[in-house]
C-alpha cells in the first residue's frame, strides 16, 4: 500500500521539482551577500589546486587558501587543464570581490558549471566481488576436499596452497578427535649437527652373512652416515681439480677394519617380551619382534662398531613411550566407553522414569474414568432399585389387599358352610322333631343374616380405615422428603376423597390454610436454616426500642457484634436466651415449643421473626390436621365390634 501511494505521488511531484529547479539556480547566484576582503583581488575561474593523496579512496580535506594579488596569473588557465584533476580532491574557489583602485580585472559572476558525473567504480566492484567469490569458492573446495576423496586429490594437486589448507584442517580435526596426542610430534625430532643415518627399505629383513664387495649394512657407505668421506682423488681423474673439504666437517681417515675392533664391540641385548609393559598386546609383541630382528641383524654385523647403539636404545625408549601411549589411549577409550555407558544408563533411567510417569498418569486417568463409571453405574442401579422397590411395594400392596379379600371370602364361605351345616342339623333336628322347632330355626336364620351383614360392614370399615391411613402416610412422606416447598394438593384431594363422609376428616382438612397446600410448606431443615438467618437479623435488632431511629439501629448493629452468643437451654427472657432455647428445640424436633418461644419476643425482634412464625404456624396446622386424621382413623378401627 505504501509503495503504491509513493508511485502515485511521483507524477504530482515532478512538475513541482521542475518549477523549483530555476529557483535553486537563482539562489546560487546570490554571492554578493557574502562577506569579502576588499584588500584582495580575485581572478575568475582560478586554476584548481589539488593535493596528492596516498590512496584515491580516502581523499584528504583541502583547506581554503586566499591567493594574494601579486601571485595571481595574468590569464585564466585552459579548460583542458582541469580535466585530469582528481575527482576525489575537492577544489576551492575564492569568493569574488569587486576591484579596488585602478585594477584591470573585470568582476563577473562565474558561469554555472554542471555537476560532474560520478564515475562508476565498476573495476573496484568487480575486484571486490571476484575476491569474495574466490574466497567462497576456495573455502567450499577445502570443505568438499574433506568430504570427497576424488575431489581431495584434484584440489591438492591443481589448486595453489590447496594441500596446505586441507592439511591444516585435517590437523585441526585430528587434534579435536585426539586431544591427548595433539601436542606430540609425529616424526622423530631431529637434532642439528648430529650424524644422520639412512637405512634402506629392505635392510634387516633377513639375517644373512654379509658378502664382500656388495652393498650391505656391514659395509661403510653413504647409507651409514650422511657425512661424506673426504677421499683423495687422483689428479688424472679430477683434471687438475682439488677436492673440496667442508670447513664444518673434519676429514675422516680411512682405517682398515680389524678383527679386534669387531670383537671389542659390545653386542646389543634384545628386548624381553615379558619385561615390556602391556606385553599381552599383540601390537606390542609385533613391535618387540621387529626391534629384536633389527637388533639381531645389527649384532650379526661385525662392523657396526656400536654405531646403532644409540638409535636402538632410542627405539627401545620410543617403544616404551608407544606402549604408554597405547595404554593411555586404551584408558581414554575405556573412560569414554564408561562415560557413554553411564550416559546410556542415565538415559535409560530417565526413559524408565518417564515411562513410569506416563503409566502413573494413565493409571490415574483410568482410575478417574473408572470412578466416574462406578458413580454413574451406582446412580443408575440406585434409580433402578428405587423404581423396583416402588413397583414391589405397589405389588405387595395389591397382593395384601387381594389376600385380605380372599381371607374374607374364605371366611364368608366357611360361615356359609357352617350355616349350611347348622341348617342341616337343625333341619334334621326339626325333621326328628317334625317341625317342632320352626320358630327357633327362623330366629337362627335371622341371626345369621344379621351376622353376615355386620361382617360385611366390618370389612368395609377396615378397608376404609386402611385407605385413610395410607393416604395420611403418603401426605406425610411427601412433606418429609421434599427438598424445596412443593404443593400437595393431589395428596390432600386423595385423602379427602377417601374420607368421603367423615366429618372429622373434612373439618381437619378445612382447617388447613389454602396457601399451605397450594404453595407447599418448608421442611424441618429449611425451617432451621431460615431460623439461623432470621436469628442473625434478630440479634442485630435485639437492643432496639420500639420507637428506634437510625442512630439506634446503627448502635444496635455495632453492639450486636460484641454480644456473647448463648447456647443450650439458656435461662432468661432476653432475645439471646430465647434464640438459644429456640435453636435447641428446633434441633430436637419440637417445632411447637420453638414457635411458642419465638412468639414470646417483643418489639423489633418479633417483627423480624413474624414471617418465620407464620411459616411455623402453617407447618403446625398441617401437622395437627394430619395427626387428627390419623387419630380418627385409629379410633374408627378400634370402634369396630
From Swiss-Prot:
Alphabetical UniProt keywords: Coiled coil, Membrane, Mitochondrion, Mitochondrion inner membrane, Transit peptide, Transmembrane, Transmembrane helix
Membrane topology annotation = Single-pass membrane protein
Q: Where in the cell is it found?
A: Mitochondrion inner membrane
What segments bear the compositional bias annotation Low complexity? 48-61, 89-106
Q: Which cellular component, as a GO term, is one annotated location?
A: MICOS complex
Keyword presence, Transit peptide: yes
Please list every transmembrane segment annotated in the UniProt record, as residue ranges.
126-146
Give residue spans, biased composition: Basic and acidic residues.
226-237
Mitochondrial matrix topological intervals: 17-125
Which positions form the organelle transit peptide? 1-16
Intervals, Mitochondrial intermembrane compartment: 147-641
Q: Return the annotated region ranges for Disordered.
A: 35-115, 180-266
GO BP annotations of the record are:
cristae formation
- Coiled-coil region: 311-408
Q: Which Pfam families match?
A: Mitofilin
Q: Where is the composition biased (Polar residues)?
A: 238-250, 257-266
UniProt family annotation: Belongs to the MICOS complex subunit Mic60 family.
Q: What does this protein do?
A: Component of the MICOS complex, a large protein complex of the mitochondrial inner membrane that plays crucial roles in the maintenance of crista junctions, inner membrane architecture, and formation of contact sites to the outer membrane. Plays a role in keeping cristae membranes connected to the inner boundary membrane. Also promotes protein import via the mitochondrial intermembrane space assembly (MIA) pathway.
**Subunit annotation:** Component of the mitochondrial contact site and cristae organizing system (MICOS) complex.
Name the UniProt record assigns to this protein? MICOS complex subunit MIC60
Its source organism is Pyrenophora tritici-repentis (strain Pt-1C-BFP)
Amino acid at each position: 500500500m505504501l509503495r503504491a501511494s509513493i508511485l502515485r505521488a511521483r507524477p504530482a511531484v515532478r512538475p513541482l521539482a521542475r518549477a523549483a529547479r530555476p529557483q535553486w539556480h537563482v539562489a546560487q547566484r546570490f554571492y554578493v551577500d557574502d562577506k569579502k576582503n576588499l584588500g584582495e583581488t580575485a581572478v575568475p575561474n582560478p586554476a584548481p589546486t589539488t593535493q596528492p593523496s596516498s590512496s584515491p579512496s580516502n581523499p584528504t580535506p583541502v583547506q581554503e587558501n586566499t591567493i594574494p594579488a601579486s601571485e595571481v596569473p595574468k590569464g585564466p588557465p585552459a579548460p583542458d587543464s582541469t580535466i585530469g584533476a582528481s575527482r576525489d580532491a575537492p577544489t576551492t574557489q575564492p569568493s569574488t570581490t569587486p576591484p579596488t583602485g585602478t585594477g584591470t580585472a573585470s568582476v563577473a559572476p562565474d558561469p554555472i558549471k554542471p555537476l560532474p558525473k560520478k564515475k562508476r567504480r565498476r573495476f573496484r566492484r568487480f575486484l571486490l566481488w571476484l575476491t569474495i567469490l574466490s574466497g567462497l569458492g576456495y573455502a567450499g573446495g577445502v570443505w568438499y576436499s574433506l568430504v570427497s576423496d576424488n575431489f581431495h586429490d584434484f584440489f591438492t594437486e591443481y589448486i595453489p596452497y590447496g594441500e596446505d589448507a586441507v592439511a591444516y584442517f585435517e590437523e585441526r580435526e585430528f587434534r579435536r578427535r585426539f586431544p591427548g596426542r595433539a601436542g606430540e610430534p609425529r616424526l622423530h625430532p631431529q637434532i642439528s649437527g648430529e650424524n644422520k643415518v639412512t637405512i634402506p627399505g629392505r635392510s634387516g629383513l633377513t639375517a644373512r652373512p654379509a658378502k664382500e664387495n656388495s652393498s650391505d649394512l656391514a659395509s661403510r657407505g653413504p647409507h651409514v652416515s650422511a657425512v661424506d668421506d673426504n677421499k683423495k682423488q687422483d689428479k688424472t681423474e679430477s683434471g687438475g681439480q682439488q677436492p673440496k673439504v667442508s670447513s664444518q666437517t673434519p676429514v675422516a681417515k680411512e682405517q682398515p677394519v680389524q678383527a679386534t675392533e669387531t670383537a671389542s664391540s659390545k653386542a646389543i641385548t634384545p628386548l624381553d617380551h615379558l619385561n615390556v609393559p602391556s606385553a599381552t598386546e599383540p601390537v606390542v609383541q609385533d613391535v618387540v619382534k621387529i626391534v629384536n630382528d633389527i637388533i639381531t641383524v645389527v649384532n650379526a654385523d661385525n662392523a657396526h662398531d656400536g654405531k646403532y647403539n644409540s638409535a636402538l636404545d632410542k627405539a627401545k625408549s620410543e617403544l616404551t613411550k608407544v606402549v604408554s601411549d597405547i595404554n593411555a589411549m586404551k584408558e581414554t577409550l575405556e573412560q569414554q566407553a564408561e562415560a557413554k555407558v553411564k550416559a546410556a544408563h542415565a538415559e535409560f533411567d530417565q526413559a524408565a522414569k518417564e515411562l513410569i510417569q506416563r503409566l502413573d498418569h494413565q493409571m490415574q486417568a483410568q482410575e478417574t474414568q473408572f470412578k466416574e463409571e462406578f458413580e454413574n453405574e451406582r446412580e443408575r442401579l440406585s434409580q433402578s432399585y428405587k423404581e423396583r422397590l416402588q413397583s414391589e411395594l405397589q405389588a405387595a400392596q395389591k397382593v395384601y389387599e387381594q389376600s385380605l379379600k380372599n381371607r374374607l371370602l374364605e371366611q364368608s364361605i366357611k360361615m356359609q358352610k357352617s350355616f349350611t351345616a347348622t341348617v342341616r342339623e337343625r333341619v334334621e333336628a326339626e325333621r326328628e322333631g317334625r317341625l317342632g322347632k320352626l320358630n327357633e330355626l327362623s330366629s337362627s336364620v335371622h341371626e345369621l343374616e344379621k351376622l353376615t351383614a355386620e361382617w360385611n360392614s366390618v370389612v368395609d370399615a377396615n378397608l376404609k380405615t386402611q385407605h385413610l391411613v395410607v393416604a395420611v402416610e403418603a401426605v406425610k412422606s411427601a412433606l418429609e422428603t421434599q427438598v424445596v416447598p412443593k404443593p400437595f394438593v393431589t395428596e390432600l384431594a386423595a385423602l379427602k376423597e377417601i374420607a368421603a363422609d367423615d366429618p372429622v376428616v373434612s373439618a381437619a382438612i378445612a382447617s388447613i390454610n389454602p396457601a399451605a397446600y397450594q404453595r407447599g410448606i418448608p421442611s424441618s431443615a429449611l425451617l432451621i436454616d431460615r431460623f439461623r438467618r432470621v436469628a442473625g437479623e434478630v440479634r442485630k435488632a435485639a437492643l432496639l426500642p420500639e420507637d428506634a431511629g437510625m442512630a439506634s439501629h446503627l448502635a444496635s448493629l455495632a453492639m450486636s457484634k460484641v454480644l456473647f452468643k448463648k447456647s443450650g437451654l439458656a435461662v432468661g427472657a432476653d432475645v439471646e436466651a430465647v434464640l438459644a432455647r429456640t435453636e435447641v428445640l428446633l434441633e430436637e424436633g419440637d417445632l411447637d415449643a420453638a414457635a411458642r418461644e419465638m412468639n414470646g419476643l417483643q418489639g423489633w425482634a418479633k417483627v423480624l421473626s413474624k414471617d418465620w412464625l407464620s411459616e411455623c404456624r402453617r407447618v403446625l396446622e398441617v401437622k395437627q390436621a394430619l395427626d387428627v386424621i390419623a387419630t380418627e382413623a385409629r379410633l374408627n378401627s378400634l370402634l369396630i365390634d
